[in-house]
A protein has these predicted regions:
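Short, conserved beta-strand/beta-arch hydrophobic-aromatic motifs that form part
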Residues: 1
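Non-transmembrane, membrane-adjacent beta-strand/coil modules in membrane-associated proteins
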Residues: 25-33, 39-90
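Terminal and domain-flanking low-complexity segments
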Residues: 35, 46, 79-116
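Conserved beta-hairpin
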Residues: 4-35, 39-41
Length: 116
């Protein structure tokens, strides 16, 4: 079971869009209504976490619930060290990035066009 946790924990989430929803796959993934997303922002670096409340944290990969400095409890899907997307929904703050910064920027462009 530890091997499975390492495998799924190290795997980047897939993010798909269907029926006015954003689906984040994998461990700690969920479905979010696009209408519930209040803002989407591209920030230059990943958030500073103070501690993990329920998540996976290994080798710079952070997935799950973390306390973020100056924000409190947030949901992270962070694999890279560069730019990061910050989503504010009606109920959560979510940070997403990928090891490939271009992939992060492409997702941001897509979200920015979908969120009104």
């Amino acid at each position: 079971s530890i091997i499975l946790l390492l495998f799924f924990g190290n795997k980047e989430p897939e993010i798909t869009f269907t029926n006015q929803q954003m689906q984040i796959s994998g461990i700690y993934g969920n479905d979010y209504n696009l209408s519930d997303i209040e803002s989407v922002t591209l920030i230059n670096e990943r958030p500073v976490t103070t501690f993990k409340t329920n998540g996976f944290d290994m080798g710079g990969i952070k997935k799950g619930h973390f306390n973020v400095q100056n924000e409190g409890n947030c949901l992270l899907f962070v694999s890279g060290t560069g730019k990061c997307i910050r989503l504010k929904t009606k109920s959560d703050v979510i940070y997403i990035n990928f090891a490939d910064e271009t992939k992060t920027e492409e997702l941001y462009g897509k979200l920015e066009g979908m969120v009104k």
